[in-house]
Amino acid sequence: MKTSRLPIAIQQAVMRRLREKLAQANLKLGRNYPEPKLSYTQRGTSAGTAWLESYKIRLNPVLLLENSEAFIEEVVPHELAHLLVWKHFGRVAPHGKEWKWMMENVLGVPARRTHQFELQSVRRNTFPYRCKCQEHQLTVRRHNRVVRGEAVYRCVHCGEQLVAK
């Protein structure tokens, strides 16, 4: 989905939230961190990604459309917090104590590592594999690696190699 297919009102709400939280952080931290670049090119089941070196936030337009209010309230500050932590502390654990502090004490948002959005519309096809204790669903990428002989996957519970059903 291209940015142009995302309603302008939603894009504006995202920018408002981003700017509001950035201003709040700059005030509390006594800094003047710049506004990050924003794109709507994230794909798959991730709601967003913070690209530290390029100081950019990628958001998933499908999940944003389907969960606008929660997405804007939670995901936008979540990704902004990653960039602010990187600027403020340098390279640290992605969801470590610095990120949690930035989320809760600076941005005033509950620090949750993962979203709870329905993923049916963005979930890719999977391929069934088995071990001796359960069935597993491998992504297209992992399935293709098995088919090409580039990878072998094992069950984390029983340790047995996964085989296609």
From Swiss-Prot:
InterPro entries: SprT-like_domain, SprT_Zn_ribbon, Uncharacterised_SprT
Record-listed Zn(2+) binding positions: H78, H82
Any Pfam family hit: SprT-like
Cofactor field: Zn(2+)
Keywords: Cytoplasm, Metal-binding, Zinc
Domain SprT-like: 20-163
GO biological process: response to stress
GO-annotated cellular components: cytoplasm
Molecular function GO labels: zinc ion binding
Active site: E79
Cofactor binding comment, as recorded: Binds 1 zinc ion.
NCBIfam families (alphabetical): PRK04860.1 (NF003421)
Name under which the protein is recorded: Protein SprT
Source organism of the structure: Shigella boydii serotype 18 (strain CDC 3083-94 / BS512)
